[in-house]
């Protein structure tokens, strides 16, 4: 073994590249002191870790969730943390639940993409698995839609496990907004409240703060926190321009958010996922949520494409839970559902049924590829 090396708190701990699916990758630099303090503290509190618990995050350690909440956060608490290589469908769709039963997992943390894929197969694959050891369920990587949340709660949590819908980013290092079991109650599709010391604010296009409730704005963080990335490796100017130039001295997350009357935050998606149709700003996340409420839909993705009259039109890529012959009827039903939930302006001009959506290793939809397909 090697003797431990004494490090300065601000010495680089690791460099992790992000956003390669949407543009030139950025090498985010995280440091020894602040990063490990914050991941340790958030892990223990958000997941309500107790000594002796068995914790499992299904992420790949090659992305930030794996770094923060498979390795550094759990291990700094002396936790038993499970590492998994594989997919939830092999050798069958009981794989996750067999592992939970085998090791007596207490905290389970996964992505909405995985939940939707498993929900698509129904609940039969859970019936013969003992999930009684579970105490806390978590989601990470993207907002979770209502249908997936309810399935997760009912069939995995047995209506008895709090669900922490965690919001954070590679750049933040650790969880910034989340419910906390026994402290801050969960709420379907909401990340809920900021973690201790985090001060999120909503801004309008001019940079003015939106202080009222039941409002939508651009999500920024008012003040620094211990695990914020310190720079982009070899390009500090790009770091400043990317995260701090839009709204002076505030960290701009790039996400939009809705704040309800109780101060709970719901992430509405990337602000660059807003499509202007006939002068109306339409966010893709609410439209996708509406589509996903259809009983036959497994998941969906919306992108814009040029339209000579509207400026932009909406193109929907939709995956069904199983094959159906009457696709035209389903497409009509989807647009009727969108009209009821959002309005006629949000109806899809084109709908393409697909067996799956292109995704990064972390489960995020690669909209850049979908835009290229839609524009042809």
Predicted regions and their residues:
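Conserved pre-ATP/AMP-binding loop-to-beta segment of ANL
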Residues: 1-17, 24, 48-54
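Conserved S/T- and glycine-rich ATP-binding loop of Class I adenylate-forming
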Residues: 12, 18-21, 43, 55, ...
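AMP-binding/adenylate-forming catalytic core of the ANL superfamily
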Residues: 101, 108, 225, 230-234, ...
